[in-house]
């Protein structure tokens, strides 16, 4: 069940649960966060619960290469396009260094597609997970962490600007996918973009 966590609850210097956006508190013995360390510690736990040394270290942390991951379910027979359990590395050309430089230095919201993506059909890799109709994909590209727009605070990640950003990036990744699976856009059942922020 997808829930928006706004706070990790701390009692006697120990994480004891989480608080949801609706105010509900869920207590637990173990709390797991898959957010960046700075988001987990500074935004969800809060500086007031951290040592000065940890706060200083978090503020000095320089993120470098990261990735954007499009999680996708398609309602179509993708085998007709040669999709199997193999991985697909799609590059706009053979110059890996130039593609990498473009990903690291460009504005990630500009353009129609990315110069390099990795595509994997998880239902072909794990046939037991295939229900006979829907295929799941992961479409991944790498980017410079600093090229991500700055969204401050938990609320910004539910703002209209953040949704527009995610839609632009998802559309670009779908354009990459369409090059090997024509008609993919018309057969999307579920789509979600994972970002490092």
Enumerate the language-model features and the residues they cover.
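Short loop/edge segments at beta-strand edges and connector loops
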Residues: 1-3
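Mid-domain catalytic core of redox enzymes
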Residues: 6-131
């Amino acid at each position: 069940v997808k829930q928006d966590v706004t706070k990790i609850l701390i009692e006697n210097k120990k994480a004891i649960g989480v608080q949801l956006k609706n105010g509900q508190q869920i207590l637990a013995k173990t709390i797991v966060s898959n957010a960046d360390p700075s988001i987990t510690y500074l935004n969800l736990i809060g500086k007031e619960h951290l040592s000065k040394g940890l706060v200083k270290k978090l503020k000095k942390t320089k993120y470098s290469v990261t990735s954007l991951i499009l999680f996708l379910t398609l309602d179509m027979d993708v085998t007709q396009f040669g999709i199997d359990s193999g991985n697909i590395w799609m590059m706009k050309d053979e110059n890996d260094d130039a593609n990498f430089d473009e990903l690291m230095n460009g504005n990630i919201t500009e353009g129609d597609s990315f110069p390099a993506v990795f595509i994997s059909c998880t239902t072909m890799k794990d046939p037991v997970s295939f229900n006979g109709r829907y295929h799941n994909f992961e479409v991944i590209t790498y980017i410079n962490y600093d090229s991500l727009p700055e969204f401050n605070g938990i609320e910004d990640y539910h703002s209209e600007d953040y949704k527009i950003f995610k839609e632009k990036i998802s559309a670009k990744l779908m354009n990459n996918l369409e090059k090997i699976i024509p008609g993919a856009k018309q057969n999307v059942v579920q789509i979600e973009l994972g970002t490092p922020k």
